[in-house]
Amino acid sequence: MAQTPPTSEARPRPPVPTLFRVALAPIQAFFRLEAASGILLALCAVAAMVWANSPWAATYSAVFDARMTVGLAGVHAGFTIREFINDGLMTLFFFVVGMEIKRELSSGELRTFSRAVLPLIAAMGGMIVPAALYAAFNQGTPAQAGWAIPMATDIAFSIGCLTLVKTRVSHGLVVFLTALAIFDDIGGILVIALFYGSGLHVSWLVGALGVLAVLACLNHFQVRNGVAYALAGAALWYTMHHGGIHATLSGVVLGLFMPARPLRPGRHVLEELRLYVDRALQTAMDEATRGAQILYLEERLEELEPPLNRFVHLWHVPVAYGIVPLFALANSGISLEGMGWADLLRPLPLGIIAGLFVGKQVGIFLFTWGSLKLGVADRPGGATLPQLHGVAVVAGIGFTVALFVAGLAFPTQPELLTEAKLGILVGSLLSAVVGYALLRFVAKPAVPA
């Protein structure tokens, strides 16, 4: 039943100074851009490269390799700032990925097989061919452990690239690339879980299963308290870390367990609120009480929003504009001292460049074209073949997850890790520039539906 709203006098909000609003306007306009997160990510990557090759290069390593120690109940753990970002904060990135995957599968573009089949097939091509190309260059060498690096598509960069040519691509193509990147994320998560662990420890994994049971109960009973999920997520991170599975994947699991249904059926809530509003309009009240009633209605309307959507909205901005750019800043700084163009022709960077720039576009385009020819699916948004080819090239921008996998593949081999980062940066840059050029100058403008 509806509760009586508070009748305390509402406090007026202090006016915002005009000068302050004017100063904030460009910042607010930037963050409203669809490509804003991709632009910020690129700026951080460039800043890291400039920093690592400047007279202050030593401070780059000093900052991100600085050690810190935390303790709780007599238990202490030490790690570097970079490890804290990569293994700690990036858990929140994977948490958002997990929630977005669940949202798309439950109520989004991937909720039916007919909608999901084409991006799924395209993603398979975009993972198989790049991995095979990399393996062809590095089979039998110490670098073969990095075979999964060119499998990833960076959704922020790739969608940001499409927004720069939005008059040339239909909304259906943007949805297609987004769904493809989501399946790429799923594939990358499975690869990390299966191939980049550190040796399984059954006792800790049993503990992780216990935490999963708790999460299942929280989901079943539609618990909306964020603290409960945070505590369960922390316990899952700890048990997976000691169990030999990369701990950041706990974020994906936690995201998949977030309730995707509203607490109560929407019709019931709206009926109650309609009756409440009718009674309120028939009663004379002052403006302060009216304001309190409106706040009460807002609180009741929150019951219509599933916890999954609420947490996606809560964490999207800090992850997209804080954690991921910080990850790029901490992991993109490559010293080019003593390097030449010949270094790009080494098997490791060449394998990554070939995988991202050649393997991605060949795999995605051929698998997509084959599916269309066989009648398995329809063209997304009535796209032309040149448009599909351009999107396939853009999907070769494999930045965030590719850097993450590189760190897992070469944790104790800094020279190989540097070569991998160089290959990722060059391959992603080639894919972005060529993909943009194809969509801007070759593909015909999108035809409005």
Curated annotation (Swiss-Prot):
GO molecular function, one term: sodium:proton antiporter activity
Alphabetic keyword roster: Antiport, Cell inner membrane, Cell membrane, Ion transport, Membrane, Sodium, Sodium transport, Transmembrane, Transmembrane helix, Transport
GO biological process: regulation of pH
InterPro entries in the cross-refs: Na/H_antiporter_dom_sf, NhaA
Role this protein plays: Na(+)/H(+) antiporter that extrudes sodium in exchange for external protons.
Family: Belongs to the NhaA Na(+)/H(+) (TC 2.A.33) antiporter family.
UniProt name for this protein: Na(+)/H(+) antiporter NhaA 1
Highest classification ranks of the organism: Bacteria, Pseudomonadati, Myxococcota, Myxococcia, Myxococcales
